[in-house]
């Protein structure tokens, strides 16, 4: 028996010795939620003590494994929760391991796939992180976006800053707020985005319509505001910021608190309060330009390994005064205001916000969920938005405190998306349904600018990106959108006949009155959008992006139906019921170099838009309320082209140089003349110093030079002056002179305890108190822009 046992043991040893332990286990380490590759992951084989790491492409290979043997493999990554996998192999095998980012938050998982991932692969995106955004706590989202090349803004006083991307704005830009496309009467040039900059963790700018998951009508681009990331671990943290400004003699406070648990439950509460009085130009007070703002947001959710759900709510409310001198109702007063070097009305500084003014409230509610289905992720979202806009004119008598414009916009949206990947192919596909209703309150006693309407939208998209090899990646996508509008509108008989609608659309009339008709247009728009592009990695430092985007945009309600006085900008606007969808073809090329000391990117583009809708001044019209400029919408074929350049150079580890240059030109190909309101050439140069050993001291000096816009259409017209019984030309076409501004910023960080720190920031905008006027400021006819402004920021992290 003893001899038998020895023989068996010997045979077993011989079998083991002869066993082929040369098998290989290979595969990828990928993110659970979106299949993105995780480079730098470590795999430890417990039985053999073998340790390997994934490559830049997330690929691993474990050699010298034995057949029919069980192994325990621990997979670790710096941004993920470690996980151990058990498996047995019988031959060379391929196995992918999935990890979950412990810094993932549901907000990014659902729509973007993972925290702060690229929204498109063939367009170079620009980003602003939370540290940069905090410098604009006293300002607006538009102020922050202005720091990016290719972005400028339409301004109207303090707090109304509307982004322009490569020359386009309003309905041609998509604004995404925490996964929700904003619906906030964005058609108005003086309707700023209703988003609190202090609620944003990161801003992403896509200067193209290539990110089709958000919409196909982003001819200018897409701005994506994302909330701060939430760590999936037991923690409680927050921040409170106090900010103040000398110009406007005001300030505010913003605070945010986040609680998270290791089981995936988390919640965040955030709020902001701002109060500013009249701002001042270099030499005088800009009367009635105060601001009063109250914002808050709440977020609560559950983020588990393969499913999650989140609820989000935000409230935005602002009162914004509009420069008193901009509302000059008489023809002679308008000419005098335009020709004067100073505003016609200059009063003592005050915090009171009188008329004219805007009061806007925007509420957003959203619930979304995701479920991981292996190689796919299913995402469902519902959101509701309520926008209330009141615009007040200077009225007398019993109507003094009654708004001249009272709009209520309700929007319901459902999104269903499916994301997945097959080896080197990633896809996104989804459908969208939206119902919107607009109510223009007739109790204002003034003819409604835009009518009541119900609007139905349906969208369907698919986007694919394929990695051909280590250097070449291609992206393509297509989207179809259908819109239906059911509108009820009153037209004066004279307007209905003057525009030829009585001949073109006689069937639209449902009721006739003595001096007006009630019509019921039912409009349909079918739009196709697409994108095709690629990026080519020349080497580790140089990348080339090429993208062509076909975008289609249905006319917005203002462009179709405007027929009255727009009180916020004191002008009559006239739309056209005959408008068709705009169709844009934008080709952009970007070369990017990222090195140790020198970074550079250049982005030329050309955008040809068929049936481009433009609004221009045509005359001054006398009404019972005074004389007002008349601006009419019309369609034409247009071309926009330009280039954006960014460069930075590190002289040493403490001193850096930064440069930006943006050029955009716009032309009306039908009339062979420049387009109105195109941003002038501008350039920014900055030198910055940072000493991490000296309380992280940062000092920067920025030079901003804006050239005069020398290409503009001639929209001047003559007006009759009854007092002198003469005609005089109104020059509203000439552009302001070039100007140069200096801005200084400094900050330091102090450790106040083991778990808290204090950051102190000081800034001076318009350091030399320069008097200037910006071509894109709607108040440039009546006043200079803001003078010197001292800014103080105190931030406590805890």
Predicted regions and their residues:
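Outer-membrane beta-barrel translocator/receptor signature
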Residues: 199-201, 212-283, 288-296, 304-307, ...
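Flexible loop and strand-edge segments within Gram-negative outer membrane beta-barrel domains
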Residues: 276, 282, 287, 308-367, ...
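N-terminal periplasmic accessory domains that precede
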Residues: 94-98, 141-144, 161-164, 176, ...
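Short, acidic, small-residue-rich periplasmic hinge/interaction motif at the N-terminus
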Residues: 30, 41-44, 74-80, 90-134, ...
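Outer membrane beta-barrel strand-and-loop segments of large Gram-negative receptors
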Residues: 402-417, 459, 574-581, 586, ...
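Gram-negative outer-membrane beta-barrel transporters
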Residues: 605-609, 618, 626-715
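C-terminal beta-signal and adjacent terminal beta-strands/loops
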Residues: 552, 609-611, 615, 657, ...
């Amino acid at each position: 028996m003893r001899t038998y046992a020895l023989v068996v043991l010997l045979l077993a040893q011989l079998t083991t010795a002869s066993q082929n332990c040369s098998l290989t286990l290979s595969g990828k380490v990928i993110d659970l939620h979106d299949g993105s590759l995780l480079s730098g992951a470590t795999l430890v084989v417990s039985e053999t003590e073998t340790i390997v790491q994934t490559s830049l492409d997330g690929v691993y290979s474990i050699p010298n494994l034995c057949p029919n043997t069980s192994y325990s493999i621990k997979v670790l990554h710096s941004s993920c929760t470690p996980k151990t996998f058990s498996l047995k192999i019988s031959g060379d095998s391929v196995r992918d391991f999935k990890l979950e980012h412990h810094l993932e938050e549901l907000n990014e998982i659902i729509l973007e796939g993972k925290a702060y991932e690229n929204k498109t692969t063939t367009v170079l995106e620009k980003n602003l992180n939370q540290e940069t955004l905090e410098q604009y706590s006293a300002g607006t989202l538009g102020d922050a976006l202005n720091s990016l090349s290719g972005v400028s803004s339409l301004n109207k006083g303090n707090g109304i800053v509307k982004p322009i991307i490569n020359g386009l704005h309003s309905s041609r830009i998509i604004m995404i707020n925490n996964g929700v496309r904003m619906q906030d009467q964005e058609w108005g040039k003086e309707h700023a985005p209703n988003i609190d900059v202090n609620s944003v963790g990161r801003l992403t700018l896509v200067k193209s319509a290539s990110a089709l998951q958000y919409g196909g009508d982003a001819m200018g681009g897409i701005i994506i505001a994302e909330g701060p990331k939430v760590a999936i671990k037991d923690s409680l943290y927050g921040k409170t910021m106090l900010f103040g400004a000398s110009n406007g003699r005001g300030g505010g406070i913003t605070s945010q608190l986040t609680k998270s648990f290791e089981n995936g439950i988390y919640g965040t509460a955030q709020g902001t309060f701002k109060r500013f009085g009249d701002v001042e130009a270099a030499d005088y007070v800009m009367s009635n330009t105060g601001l009063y703002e109250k914002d808050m947001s709440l977020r609560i959710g559950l983020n588990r390994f393969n499913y999650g759900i989140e609820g989000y709510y935000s409230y935005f409310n602002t009162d914004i005064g509009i420069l008193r001198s901009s509302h000059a109702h008489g023809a002679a007063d308008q000419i005098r205001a335009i020709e004067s070097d100073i505003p016609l009305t200059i009063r003592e500084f005050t915090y009171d916000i009188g008329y004219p003014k805007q009061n806007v409230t925007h509420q957003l509610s959203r619930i979304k969920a995701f479920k991981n289905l292996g190689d796919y992720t299913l995402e469902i979202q519902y959101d509701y938005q309520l926008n209330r806009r009141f615009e007040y004119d200077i009225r007398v008598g019993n109507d003094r405190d009654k708004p001249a414009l009272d709009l209520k916009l309700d929007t319901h949206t459902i999104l269903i998306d499916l994301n997945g990947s097959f080896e080197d192919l990633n896809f996104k596909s989804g459908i969208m349904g939206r119902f919107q209703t607009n109510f223009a309150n007739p109790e204002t006693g003034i003819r409604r600018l835009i009518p009541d309407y119900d609007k139905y939208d349906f969208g369907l998209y698919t986007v694919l990106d394929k990695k051909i090899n280590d250097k070449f990646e291609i992206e393509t996508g297509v989207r179809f959108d259908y819109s239906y509008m059911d509108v009820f509108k009153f037209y004066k008989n004279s307007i209905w006949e003057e525009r030829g609608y009585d001949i073109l659309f006689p069937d639209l009339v449902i009721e006739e009155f003595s001096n007006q008709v009630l019509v019921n247009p039912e409009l349909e728009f079918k739009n196709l959008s697409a994108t095709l592009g690629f990026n080519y990695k020349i080497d580790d430092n140089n990348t080339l992006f090429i993208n062509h985007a076909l975008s289609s945009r249905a006319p917005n309600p203002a462009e179709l139906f405007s027929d009255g006085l727009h009180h916020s900008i004191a002008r009559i606007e006239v739309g056209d019921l005959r408008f068709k969808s705009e169709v844009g073809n934008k080709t952009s090329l970007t070369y990017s170099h990222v090195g140790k000391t020198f970074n550079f990117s250049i982005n030329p583009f050309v955008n040809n838009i068929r049936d481009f809708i433009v609004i221009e001044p045509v005359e001054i019209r006398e009404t019972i309320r005074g004389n007002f400029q008349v601006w009419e919408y019309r369609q034409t074929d247009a071309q926009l082209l330009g280039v954006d350049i960014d460069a930075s150079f590190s002289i040493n580890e403490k001193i850096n140089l930064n440069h930006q240059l943006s050029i955009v030109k716009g032309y009306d190909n039908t009339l062979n003349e420049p387009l109105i309101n195109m941003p002038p050439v501008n350039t920014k140069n900055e030198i910055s110093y940072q000493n991490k050993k000296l309380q992280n001291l940062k000092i920067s000096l920025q030079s901003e030079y804006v050239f005069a816009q020398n290409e503009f259409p001639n929209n001047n017209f003559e007006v009759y002056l009854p007092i002198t019984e003469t005609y005089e030309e109104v020059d509203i076409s000439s552009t302001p002179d070039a100007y140069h501004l200096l801005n200084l910023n400094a900050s330091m960080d102090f450790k106040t305890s083991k778990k808290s720190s204090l950051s102190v920031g000081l800034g001076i905008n318009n350091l030399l108190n320069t008097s200037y006027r910006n071509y894109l400021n709607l108040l440039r006819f009546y006043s200079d822009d803001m003078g010197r402004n001292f800014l103080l920021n105190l931030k406590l992290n805890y």
